[in-house]
Amino acid sequence: MAALAVLRYAGSSPLLWGWGPILFGLLGSVFVLLLPLVGIEEQCCATLKGLALLRCQMWGGIQRPVVHTTSLAVPFTALDLLPQKVKPSKETQLEAKAALQQALEMKKSGKREKAHKLLVHALNMNPEFVEALTELGTILEEEKDVVQADHLYTKALAISPCHEKALVSRDRTLPLVEEIDQRHFGIIDGKVRRLMSIPKGNSALRRVMEETYYHHIYHTVAIEGNTLTLSEIRHIIETRYAVPGKSLQEQNEAIGVDVAMKYINTTLLSRDGAITVNDILEIHRRVLGYADPVEAGRFRVNQVFVGHHIPPHPQDLDKHMQELVQWLNSEETLHLHPVEFAALAHYKLVYVHPFVDGNGRTSRLLMNLILMQASYPPITIRKEQRAEYYAALDTANEGDVRPFIRFIAKCTEMTLDTLLIATTEHAVGLPGASNHACPDCKQTIPVHS
């Protein structure tokens, strides 16, 4: 305790304000390593708890959730606006507390499965019930689901930054989760190296890359409700003629993504230098240029609401976009894994939501631009993953972006696996791909003059 008193006094020194959180992180890690040692577990837990509380007293609580990546906290002021949710009624809160008490009793008597269900029930009634989040995290951690446990601790701290048990638990799980994430990145890197070792002239690789191109257009518009089939999109892109009986708006959406992808491939990828706001505007100008030429390539002028998320006011868009490109070109991003960097860029742009329409398509293209700059293939988020994709974005809006990064990492690995399998001796085409032209497509009127 004397040592803690010295640290408390030292924390008042301006020289330690920058190094203080790092110092506490290192001390916390040391005590985590001591936890398993026989005979000192309680002392270590008590000391770790003291460090966590002291950190809160010296540096204060975080007023709003910050973006937590797998390796680097990247503050971003666009997160100042958080989702506004209706609070549960007093009766519902009391019922949630009763469920928590029952869960604790069940856990004490060894009925862990019942305790788990009761805690889930409590959180269904009150999603921001910090004690229930922390207790469920503890159960998941004991069940070796450390990633989900860490997420629950993080969510609890986003709501109550100085919650004692959540602080101690998060300090314990964070290093383990970072190790898991970095190990997954290592697996992805190995698959990228295997793909890069295939000669560029390989006919199977060329064929599957062409199929992947059309698949990306199909899935990126289908995620947002476009009803065109893969064969119809291929016909539209190759002929620029309309598909009878289909919405011209939907067909122009597909052409816009195609034109934007060609712009990235022929212009941005071959150019040295920083990514600029104008680059993002030019991507969007092409994404929306056929479906809505008036709004293409310009920021929105009205406030929009996306579910519970409230994007920045139109008057603040210039500032937020300048912050975004400053971050995109900062030294901080050099320390991020390419998948992590690309996922964060996607999230930050879609969070600002600078356009009336086409924010998701533009964000996914920006993500792929960053991946391709790092010699990764462009990835596809499949329409079947729509619910998981949006859920990960919602989770990021609540203060923990790591599940979204993991989702993008999974999509990256799926894309790599598809490319590698297609170039093996017994290769097959991509799921849903067809070598046949659209059976009902005939050369009719041009989609866009």
UniProtKB/Swiss-Prot annotation:
Main location class: membrane
EC number: 2.7.7.108
Positions contributing to ATP binding: E224, E250, Q251, G358, N359, G360, R364
Protein's cellular compartments: Membrane
Key words of the record: ATP-binding, Membrane, Nucleotide-binding, Nucleotidyltransferase, Repeat, TPR repeat, Transferase, Transmembrane, Transmembrane helix
Ranges that cross the membrane: 15-35
InterPro entries: Fido, Fido-like_dom_sf, Fido_containing, TPR-like_helical_dom_sf, TPR_rpt
Stretches assigned to the Fido domain: 275-410
Catalyzed reaction equations: L-tyrosyl-[protein] + ATP = O-(5'-adenylyl)-L-tyrosyl-[protein] + diphosphate; L-threonyl-[protein] + ATP = 3-O-(5'-adenylyl)-L-threonyl-[protein] + diphosphate
Membrane topology label: Single-pass membrane protein
Repeat (TPR) residue spans along the chain: 96-129, 130-163
An individual GO BP term: protein adenylylation
A GO CC annotation given for this chain: membrane
The keyword Transferase is assigned to this record: yes
Top-rank taxon: Eukaryota
Family: Belongs to the fic family.
Comment, domains: The fido domain mediates the adenylyltransferase activity.
Cited function: Adenylyltransferase that mediates the addition of adenosine 5'-monophosphate (AMP) to specific residues of target proteins.
Protein name: Protein adenylyltransferase FICD
Encoding gene, per UniProt annotation: ficd
